[in-house]
Each structure stands twice: as C-alpha cells, then as structure tokens.
Curated annotation (Swiss-Prot):
Pfam families: LbH_GLGC, NTP_transferase. This is Glucose-1-phosphate adenylyltransferase small subunit, chloroplastic/amyloplastic. Activated by 3'phosphoglycerate, inhibited by orthophosphate. Allosteric regulation. One of its GO terms (cellular component) is amyloplast. Leaves and starchy endosperm. One of its GO terms (molecular function) is glucose-1-phosphate adenylyltransferase activity. The lineage of its organism: Eukaryota, Viridiplantae, Streptophyta, Embryophyta, Tracheophyta.
Amino acid sequence: MAMAAAASPSKILIPPHRASAVTAAASTSCDSLRLLCAPRGRPGPRGLVARPVPRRPFFFSPRAVSDSKSSQTCLDPDASTSVLGIILGGGAGTRLYPLTKKRAKPAVPLGANYRLIDIPVSNCLNSNISKIYVLTQFNSASLNRHLSRAYGSNIGGYKNEGFVEVLAAQQSPDNPDWFQGTADAVRQYLWLFEEHNVMEYLILAGDHLYRMDYEKFIQAHRETDADITVAALPMDEERATAFGLMKIDEEGRIIEFAEKPKGEQLKAMMVDTTILGLEDARAKEMPYIASMGIYVISKHVMLQLLREQFPGANDFGSEVIPGATSTGMRVQAYLYDGYWEDIGTIEAFYNANLGITKKPIPDFSFYDRSAPIYTQPRHLPPSKVLDADVTDSVIGEGCVIKNCKIHHSVVGLRSCISEGAIIEDTLLMGADYYETEADKKLLAEKGGIPIGIGKNSHIKRAIIDKNARIGDNVMIINVDNVQEAARETDGYFIKSGIVTVIKDALLPSGTVI
C-alpha cells in the first residue's frame, strides 16, 4: 500500500464503517435512516421501498443540515459506490508566489510532513469516498509525482475499485482552450465523469485546510432532496466582508448571493443561523454564512447545468450556483462550524502552518486518530536533536538539529540546522534529499554552502522553501520592517512583512535581510 499517515505508516487507508452502520445492535436505526436517504422509489434494506419525498422536505431536525458530530450517518447507496470526488487543482497561484514558482498550489508543503492536496484526499478517504479525480493545469509535475507515490496503488473502496487519478488540462479538436475556471474544468471532463454510475459529484478545492466528514454533507443533500448543496461557514461581521455571502430561507434553501458586501448590503445578508443548527448564543455572534467553495451536485443536475443551461459559464461560485438558484433549482446550505482556512495568500499560508503549534489546542490537528491525514510514505529516519532548545514547535521526519534554538516554528522534512542558529516564528520546508558527506566535502573545498541553515544564523517570521542554502551568520529578520518587496534575483520576496526565501535559493554567509 503506497500511502500512510505520517505518524503511522501501517494504518489502513479506508477506515472501517462506523459500528452503527454494520453491527446488529444498530441495524434497526440504520434501516430507518437508509429509508430517509434512499432516492425516491429505490428499494431500501430488507426489500422495503422508500416513500416518495416531496420537493419541500420535512426537516426532522435543524441538525440534518449541519456538521453535527453527534448525528448518525447511514448512506444508501454507500458513498464508495455512489459518489465521485472531484478535486480542483486551482489556478496559477499568483498570490502564493514564489511558493508556486515551481509547483501547483495543492503541491505546496504543509505542516512539516504533508502537502495541501493531502487534506481533501484524506477527507475523502475518511468519508468512504474512494473514487477521486484531481484536475490540474499549472506546474503540475510535483503534484502528479506526489499523488502517484502517495495514492498510486489500490486504495480500497467498494470491491477494491478505489483510485486517485490526475486529469491534466488538455487541448482537443472540440475544445482548443485550457481550463477557464472551476466549472469549465469539470465541463471538459464531463464525458469521463458521466461514465461513472454514481448519484452525486462532490466538488472540492485543493488548497483548503480543514477536516470534514463528507458523508454527513452528502446525507444532508439527500435528506433535503436538494439539487445542489453548498458547504457554508458561519461568519461574524468583521470577517464577512471578505467573503461571498449567502442568504437562506427558513428551510435552509439559498435564495440570494452577495460577493464581499459592505454597509447596508452586508446587513441585508444577515440570516438566522439557528436554522442550520447553531446554538442561539453562537448564532448571535455569527449571523452570516459564507460559501466554502465545496459542493455536492446531483449527477443529472451537473450534466444539465454545464451542458444545457450554462454552457458558457466558467466558474461555479459566481456563475453556475447563483444561476441554478435563479432557475428555481433547490440549492441548500449545509453548515460546517469548524476550522477552515483558504490557503490563498502568503500570510494565510504562514498563519495556517504556525497555527498547528498553538497551545493548548492547535487550530488544526494532525493527531486525530479518527480522521488521519495521509501522505506519501518516505521511510525517513527519526529526527535527531543534539543539545538543542526546541519549544512550541513541530519537527518533521528525518531532520538533523544541532545545538540551536527553535521556538514557535514548523521544521520540515530533512531540515539540517547548524550550531548556534536561532529559528523563531518560522516555517522551514526542509529538503527533497540529503547531501552525502562527500557532497559536503566537495562543496567546502569550492567554498559552497550545503543545504540547510548555517551556523549562528538568525531567522524570524519567515518561510524558507525547500533546498535553500543559508550560509553562516545570515540574518533574515526583516530589519527595515519592509512589507512588500520582490528581490527574486537575490533569492527572496517579502509579502505582508513575511520574508519568503525561494526554493533552491542561495544566501551567502553574512547576508542581512
């Protein structure tokens, strides 16, 4: 098996179904739920037939449309046979440059051991969705390599038919253009997606950080008899102005959209979020809901929207979903009240990574046994820490850390940090390979600098991309408090006051930034 949780390479990929779905003790309750979830007229368990569901559904509880941890999930048909996951690789990632100079956004390293793409793929696998496509276009080489190494062999699922496959943008006689947007990317591969005998398509982004049970999301879609279900994040007034907001009716049906509203337009988008399951006190703090860019779309609806109703639409969020609402389709909101971060900018990426070091509870935890995050098994040795002072930090596999100080930082794979170095509030991405002793000796003879952090260097509030060579006595502390600077020829950029050293860059000894 070519995939593993970083902390436990031997773990089974597809976690077993929840005991409630397979044990005799819970069979009666699950049969009841299956009848509710089954499509109209479809035979349920034990020969029973589900009653036709009216277009205006009866809500058994507001929790039916929220990500409640206490709710029970019994999908029929099972997600492994009835849902196709489609992960969008994203655009050129210009706001994340220079991290996207040589890689696609979803391939950007995350949390010492992982890459961004591991998040949606792991969420799918943990939700029993094992048929997954990843659509890519820009700088796809490292993303393709990671996916093939991490998820290339059989990954289980129904009759061991699971897969994670990369679909690259391509030109054809019928369509000479590259992907023009999220909807266009899906449209160009509809011929392939249509071949799968599934009920729904699950549309996901490849650059979000969150942990979500998609089975509950899909169950809500079926229970409400929706054509489209949109994952929604509760928002307070301060954050709401930066997002696309949605307004819902008393049944949780989306009736209006507004992109980054302000003033009176913002107030007009207030909703009663208790409809979606929030407690009264929290609902008062969070009176807005924002789209997460995550959708469950019934198969026949997707084909109709992209081929017939909106054949020229390029984007789901700004064109297809509002268009479907305007034509009278049932577009439901599904509340996700957990940590979620769109890794769209250098600042957001930096904060998301350092957030995993937060005490006592990190913003996002990679240590959840019930829903692990999988990645490529690299078979690296344990990290070696020699006479170092390390506090409030996360250290990846295979690092060599000598007599230095590391505080509130994330240290990536194969990082080498020399004596006397000080690393504070920093993300080190590490290296793709080790240099041999012979390599280092040859470099020293030529006056070169090995991969890693040199002696007595001081790095604060920075991102050091992979394979960077930082010499001795280097200061990366933004001494002039510069907020924006593009010094690519010198090996670094500054965005939002954060210094980002480019992949494979070389900073000579004594450099001061």
